[in-house]
Curated annotation (Swiss-Prot):
One GO CC term on file: plasma membrane
Residues covered by the PpiC domain: 132-222
Chain residues carrying a lipid of type S-diacylglycerol cysteine: 22
UniProt xrefs under SUPFAM superfamilies: FKBP-like, Triger factor/SurA peptide-binding domain-like
Protein name per UniProt: Foldase protein PrsA 3
HAMAP family: Foldase_PrsA
Source species, domain of life: Bacteria
Length: 283
């Protein structure tokens, strides 16, 4: 899904660039109610899409200047796009004014470079900070401390944790599974929760832990032995890379953009677009 979105974003840019290249008085449309010239169309596109297109063009140059993308890498992405779009692939190329797959490869290179840039944000420290044992974790989330203490007391008295989660937990995503958090891993929960969870051994239950969501009673149901760092460091790095590529907050994408464009020493000579990169001055 992600790569399909990238592909569609690329071809939309192609449409804008192709149409805004027009500038003559030739008619694009004739009708009884009036004609539309290429110059009029070009002006309209420039006003509506010029700033965003200029931004994308400069960003693409900055990306490809720092992160090189080979023809083979681009070809692989094109093949994946063909598989996803099926019979619509060829007609889509024609619609956006691309003559062949080679032209599309060039248009997709900045997107590939962007992925490389985000992956490059992962440091050795990030990998070491995520070097933690695999665990299965369950929790019961309640709104107030009083309820949290009452539920913890029930756990201490031997009541079933999963049953209590179904009865009390406010977390609709886990309560019906007895509080089990699917795919618990470093960086996927708030700091207070994560720190408390990793301090527990298998079978242990925490005291109430306060976070922005409320109060959690955390139980570690399984905790595997930590493997040697050299055996798992590559896997850890790949996991972090995927988390950042899929990050819905846009944090890592914006970090990459800000750093690249600041280093690019951009000067806009066209008054109409003088504010395109003003956000960099505020950082």
């Amino acid at each position: 899904m992600k790569k399909k979105k990238l592909f569609l974003g690329t071809i939309i840019s192609c449409v804008v660039l192709a149409l805004s290249a027009c500038g003559s008085s030739d008619n694009v449309v004739t009708s009884k109610v009036g004609n539309i010239t290429e110059k009029e169309l070009s002006k309209e596109l420039r006003q509506k899409y010029g700033e965003s297109t200029l931004y994308q063009m400069v960003l693409s140059k900055a990306l490809l200047d720092k992160y090189k993308v080979s023809d083979e890498e681009a070809k692989k992405q094109v093949e994946e796009a063909k598989d996803k779009m099926g019979d619509n692939f060829k007609s889509t190329l024609e619609q956006v004014g691309l003559k062949n797959e080679d032209e599309l490869k060039e248009k997709m290179k900045p997107e590939i470079a962007f992925e490389k840039a985000i992956k490059a944000t992962v440091t050795e420290k990030d990998v070491k900070d995520n070097y933690k044992p695999e665990m299965k974790v369950s929790h019961i989330l309640v709104k107030d401390e009083k309820t949290a203490k009452e539920v913890k007391e029930k756990v201490n008295n031997g009541e079933d944790f999963a049953a209590l989660a179904k009865q009390y937990s406010e977390d609709t995503g886990s309560k019906e599974q007895g509080g089990e958090i699917t795919g618990f891993a470093p960086g996927q929960t708030v700091k207070e929760f994560e720190e408390a969870a990793y301090k527990l051994d298998a079978g242990q239950v925490s005291e109430p832990v306060k976070t922005t969501y409320g109060y959690h009673i955390i139980k570690v149901t399984d905790k595997k032995e930590l493997k040697p760092f050299d055996e798992v460091k590559d896997s850890i790095r790949k996991d972090i890379e995927q988390q950042r590529l899929q990050d819905t907050t846009g944090k890592w994408k914006q970090q990459v953009v800000n750093e690249l464009l600041k280093d690019a020493d951009i000067k806009v000579n066209d008054k109409e677009f003088k504010n395109t990169f003003e956000f960099l001055e505020k950082k």
